[in-house]
Regions:
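Conserved catalytic-core segments of large NTP-driven translation/proteostasis enzymes
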Residues: 1-154
Length: 157
């Protein structure tokens, strides 16, 4: 065909499988969050919020106590001070596709059902946050310093 698809497929097949860290405290990056309850659902049938993402390291298990960081973020309009309050919850379900899991390991996408108010997880409101064990989470950074330089010219544009 002239598009070198065979070379591309050969290259993809040679990409090494990344090493997985199963021993560190778990960290999962959230790429989706949602409320699985239908409008008008009976109170007895309400479920907690759900977060979807991938585990970076460690293992998550049903029943684990977790924190979601940074959680609720507020900014004082007068002083400009930014504060955050992490959410604490517990894992009540783990799913990959339609499969119920007892535990989840790094790699692939999973859904984590939690004992958390579904309003907190509605409409992807937790995207970019981290799930992990309490007291074993990375620090929250409010400010970062960035050093950059402009390219003198662009090639191929």
């Amino acid at each position: 065909m002239g598009y070198n698809i065979d070379a591309l497929v050969d290259y993809i097949c040679r990409i090494p499988i990344p090493l997985r860290d199963f021993t560190s405290p778990p960290q999962m990056i959230i790429i989706r969050s949602f409320d699985v309850n239908q409008p008008g659902e009976d109170v007895e049938n309400l479920k907690g919020g759900v977060a979807g993402g991938t585990i970076i390291k460690g293992v998550l298990k049903i029943g684990d106590r977790i924190s979601i960081r940074p959680g609720a973020i507020t900014k004082n309009q007068k002083t400009g001070v930014v504060k955050w309050k992490e959410y604490d919850s517990q894992i009540i379900s783990l799913k990959a596709d339609e499969n119920q899991l007892m535990y989840a390991v790094p790699g692939g996408l999973i859904g984590v059902g939690m004992k958390i108010d579904p309003d907190i997880t509605r409409s992807d409101s937790l995207v970019g946050q981290i799930i992990g064990h309490p007291d074993k989470m990375p620090d929250v950074l409010i400010n970062i310093d960035v050093t950059y330089y402009l390219l003198k010219r662009l090639i191929g544009v």
